[in-house]
Structures are given as structure tokens and as C-alpha cells.
From Swiss-Prot:
NCBIfam families: S18 (TIGR00165). Binds as a heterodimer with protein bS6 to the central domain of the 16S rRNA, where it helps stabilize the platform of the 30S subunit. The gene is rpsR. This is Small ribosomal subunit protein bS18. Part of the 30S ribosomal subunit. Forms a tight heterodimer with protein bS6. The keyword Ribonucleoprotein applies. PROSITE patterns: RIBOSOMAL_S18. It comes from Renibacterium salmoninarum (strain ATCC 33209 / DSM 20767 / JCM 11484 / NBRC 15589 / NCIMB 2235). It comes from the Bacteria. InterPro entries: Ribosomal_bS18, Ribosomal_bS18_CS, Ribosomal_bS18_sf. Pfam families: Ribosomal_S18.
Length: 79
């Protein structure tokens, strides 16, 4: 029997490198909105295609933007 061929996942393009963005700022709401879901949750790295370091910076920037009411907190709550 022939060995099954292993499929490799297609590498995702990094949206920050494609747009030539080096600085992630909490005041750049348009950029940060690309990394949060319609419910306001931070999207996972495997979904967005960013590096570990970039994901940390994005998460921190989103949290800072939420603190100063530029972005909503996740979920609408009950009722």
C-alpha cells in the first residue's frame, strides 16, 4: 500500500507586512478593528496570520483602546 500524502496548510500572508505597518498604536482604531470579531473579541493568531510578537502588541493595543473607550469590550451581555 502506498503511503498517504500529508497535506501542508497554505501559509497565510501577514496583513501587517503586506500593508508595511511597523508600529501598532492603540489610537489606530481602523487597523485594530481588523483584528477583532464582530462580537468585539480579539481574533486568534491562526486566523489573522500575524507573528507571536505582533499578536502580543495587537492584543495590548486593543486592551488600551478599550480602556479609553475607542473600542468596545467583547460581548453585549445578557438581556
Amino acid at each position: 500500500m502506498a503511503k498517504a500524502e500529508i497535506r501542508k496548510p497554505k501559509p497565510k500572508s501577514n496583513p501587517l507586512k503586506a500593508a508595511d505597518i511597523t508600529v501598532i498604536d492603540y489610537k489606530d482604531v481602523a487597523l485594530l478593528r481588523k483584528f477583532i470579531s464582530d462580537r468585539g473579541k480579539i481574533r486568534a493568531r491562526r486566523v489573522t496570520g500575524v507573528t507571536v510578537q505582533e499578536q502580543r502588541k495587537i492584543a495590548q493595543a486593543i486592551k488600551n483602546a478599550r480602556e479609553v473607550a475607542l473600542l468596545p469590550y467583547s460581548g453585549a451581555g445578557r438581556g
